[in-house]
Swiss-Prot record:
Organism: Erwinia tasmaniensis (strain DSM 17950 / CFBP 7177 / CIP 109463 / NCPPB 4357 / Et1/99)
Molecular function terms from GO: acyl binding; acyl carrier activity
Protein name: Acyl carrier protein
HAMAP family tied to this protein: Acyl_carrier (MF_01217)
Localization in the cell: Cytoplasm
Keywords: Cytoplasm, Fatty acid biosynthesis, Fatty acid metabolism, Lipid biosynthesis, Lipid metabolism, Phosphopantetheine, Phosphoprotein
Domain of life: Bacteria
Database matches in Pfam families: PP-binding
Matching InterPro entries: ACP, ACP-like_sf, PP-bd_ACP, Ppantetheine_attach_site
Gene3D superfamilies: ACP-like
Major site of localization recorded for this protein: cytoplasm
GO cellular component: cytosol; membrane
Similarity comment: Belongs to the acyl carrier protein (ACP) family.
Post-translational modification: 4'-phosphopantetheine is transferred from CoA to a specific serine of apo-ACP by AcpS. This modification is essential for activity because fatty acids are bound in thioester linkage to the sulfhydryl of the prosthetic group.
Amino acid sequence: MSTIEERVKKIIGEQLGVKQEEVVNTASFVEDLGADSLDTVELVMALEEEFDTEIPDEEAEKITTVQAAIDYINGHQA
């Protein structure tokens, strides 16, 4: 089984259509990876599905970087 970090990065790459090597922990979805607001909503939905969790809107708004997504999932896994 892949690590959470690997799974999160794979989803981000697929959702945003960027090369895996561009998905570094410090990358901002909007500024570095070219996401728009719809992309970020779809990304959160993909993360929710992959990790069988629900990310409240107020939390989703704080997830703006690759590392923030990894940290959120790590902190909310059963």
